[in-house]
């Protein structure tokens, strides 16, 4: 008779322990219920990028002196700089400048080491296309400034999500 009583007591203790574990899990679930969602509805909502975000490169043709520092510091020798030496003034004249964003790793070395600051990083990150050849930007495409998501009234911007207090 005693083994049956002890088994019944063990069964009761296990039931109480299981109920406690289920209750703890349920309390964790309830604590997450009052938080705001982490995900955003992407095409209609966009996060504002940080100041140091490395997006598409903007190029100012008039400032470039064709020194090719950007090509030398690029880990994959990506920027294509075509220039011609003007013999009468003994200066380089820039003919063409292009970057293929299908290959670019967005390291920012070209922007950092440019002596004339003709390169800068923008907040644009939507570079997807159906044809990879469209990602090869020449100096005209690189010179276009991206449309700011702050100016687009169809997109709801999310600046900072409220932080969770622990």
From Swiss-Prot:
Where this protein primarily resides, as one coarse class? Answer: plastid
For [4Fe-4S] cluster 2, which residues are the binding ones? 74, 104, 107, 110
Localization (cell):
Plastid, Chloroplast thylakoid membrane
The chemistry this enzyme catalyses reads: a plastoquinone + NADH + (n+1) H(+)(in) = a plastoquinol + NAD(+) + n H(+)(out); a plastoquinone + NADPH + (n+1) H(+)(in) = a plastoquinol + NADP(+) + n H(+)(out)
Q: How, per the record, is the cofactor bound?
A: Binds 2 [4Fe-4S] clusters per subunit.
Quick check: keyword Ribosomal protein in the entry?
no
What is the membrane topology listed in the Swiss-Prot or TrEMBL record?
A: Peripheral membrane protein
* One GO cellular component term noted in the UniProt record for this chain: chloroplast thylakoid membrane
In short, the EC number is 7.1.1.-
Which keywords accompany this UniProt record? Answer: 4Fe-4S, Chloroplast, Iron, Iron-sulfur, Membrane, Metal-binding, NAD, NADP, Plastid, Plastoquinone, Quinone, Repeat, Thylakoid, Translocase
Cofactor(s) listed: [4Fe-4S] cluster
Against Pfam families, the record matches this protein to:
Fer4
Residues reported to bind [4Fe-4S] cluster 1: 64, 67, 70, 114
4Fe-4S ferredoxin-type domain ranges (all copies) = 55-84, 95-124
Q: Which domain of life is it from?
A: Eukaryota
The biological processes this protein is annotated with in GO are: photosynthesis, light reaction
Enzyme class of the recorded protein, top EC level: translocase
State the Gene Ontology terms under molecular function.
4 iron, 4 sulfur cluster binding; iron ion binding; NADH dehydrogenase (ubiquinone) activity; quinone binding
State whether keyword Thylakoid applies: yes
Q: Which InterPro entries match?
A: 4Fe4S_Fe-S-bd, 4Fe4S_Fe_S_CS, NADH_quinone_OxRdtase_chainI, NDHI
- Cross-referenced PANTHER family: NAD(P)H-QUINONE OXIDOREDUCTASE SUBUNIT I, CHLOROPLASTIC (PTHR47275:SF1)
Functional summary from the UniProt entry? NDH shuttles electrons from NAD(P)H:plastoquinone, via FMN and iron-sulfur (Fe-S) centers, to quinones in the photosynthetic chain and possibly in a chloroplast respiratory chain. The immediate electron acceptor for the enzyme in this species is believed to be plastoquinone. Couples the redox reaction to proton translocation, and thus conserves the redox energy in a proton gradient.
Note the subunit structure: NDH is composed of at least 16 different subunits, 5 of which are encoded in the nucleus.
Which family does the similarity line name?
A: Belongs to the complex I 23 kDa subunit family.
Q: What is this protein called?
A: NAD(P)H-quinone oxidoreductase subunit I, chloroplastic
Q: Name the source organism.
A: Chaetymenia peduncularis (Daisy)
Q: Upper lineage ranks?
A: Eukaryota, Viridiplantae, Streptophyta, Embryophyta, Tracheophyta
């Amino acid at each position: 008779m005693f083994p049956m009583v002890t088994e019944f007591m063990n069964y009761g203790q296990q039931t109480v322990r299981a109920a406690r574990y289920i209750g703890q899990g349920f309390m964790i679930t309830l604590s997450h219920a009052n938080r705001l969602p982490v995900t955003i509805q992407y095409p209609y909502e966009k996060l504002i990028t940080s100041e140091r975000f490395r997006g598409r490169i903007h190029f100012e043709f008039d400032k470039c002196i064709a020194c090719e520092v950007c090509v030398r510091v690029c880990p994959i020798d990506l920027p294509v700089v075509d220039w011609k030496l003007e013999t009468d003034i003994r200066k380089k004249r820039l003919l063409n400048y292009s970057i293929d964003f299908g290959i670019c790793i967005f390291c920012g070395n070209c922007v950092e080491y440019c002596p004339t600051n003709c390169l800068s990083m923008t907040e644009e990150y939507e570079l997807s296309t159906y044809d990879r050849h469209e990602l090869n930007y020449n100096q005209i495409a690189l010179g276009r400034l991206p449309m700011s998501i702050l100016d687009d009234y169809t997109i709801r911007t999310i600046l900072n999500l409220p932080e969770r207090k622990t």
